């Protein structure tokens, strides 16, 4: 299966640094049949990034509102996302859930706004350290996915990318063990298999949580890991390109 390598730039960068970053990422060498690339800049820089990256690199937004156009000051609608030429959308990132109190219902409502568009949704799920240590991992992940799995058709679900990001490993330098990552991805796939086995086999489940060049090969080689959602390491073109290179090599072997 083609690996999907995505960079979440979060609220970082300025016009100068982003131009340098785009220039660096444009130099990445990879087979597009084996690896797909996408980046998520801050919304004010999206048009700049689209114009500065090769067409083969997807560009996405980090968030939208679940409202339609109208009197919602400061928000960005699904229609606007399509209008500016975005390819991807992050939904339900742990920082949105924890800092802005986004609920599973909010995540579903945002997904529902774009599921029948050309945009590829990347739905983020993950547990806290307390959840894992108290044995609630499976319950938490199943709950986060329940509205989506119960209300979307198999055809709609096939458009979704799922990003598993253990909250305790994001930006902390702490990485889940290879066994933890594989077991969790396998569990997520088992939830999808209850809906449709073919869907479970073909859907992309990517890992996010302190993924960087030095651990990319081991993580991306796991059988149920179809790519990565990279945070800090995606702000350095050389390191992001090395992760892309590792993914390309894995798909060549």
From Swiss-Prot:
Q: Where does substrate bind?
A: 8-10, 171, 210, 231-232
Keywords of the record: Cytoplasm, Gluconeogenesis, Glycolysis, Isomerase
Q: Which domain of life is it from?
A: Bacteria
BP GO terms, sorted: gluconeogenesis; glyceraldehyde-3-phosphate biosynthetic process; glycerol catabolic process; glycolytic process
Asked if the keyword Isomerase belongs to this entry, the reply reads: yes
Query: What EC numbers are recorded for this enzyme?
Result: 5.3.1.1
Instruction: Tell me which Pfam families the record gives.
Output: TIM
SUPFAM superfamilies listed in its UniProt record: Triosephosphate isomerase (TIM) (SSF51351)
The protein's GO terms of the molecular function aspect are: triose-phosphate isomerase activity
Subcellular location as annotated: Cytoplasm
Give the pathway annotation.
Carbohydrate biosynthesis; gluconeogenesis; Carbohydrate degradation; glycolysis; D-glyceraldehyde 3-phosphate from glycerone phosphate: step 1/1
Main location group = cytoplasm
User: Catalytic residues per the record?
Assistant: 93, 165
The entry's family comment says:
Belongs to the triosephosphate isomerase family.
Q: Which NCBIfam families match?
A: tim
Q: What does this protein do?
A: Involved in the gluconeogenesis. Catalyzes stereospecifically the conversion of dihydroxyacetone phosphate (DHAP) to D-glyceraldehyde-3-phosphate (G3P).
Protein name stated in the entry: Triosephosphate isomerase
Instruction: Specify the species.
Output: Francisella tularensis subsp. novicida (strain U112)
UniProt gene name: tpiA
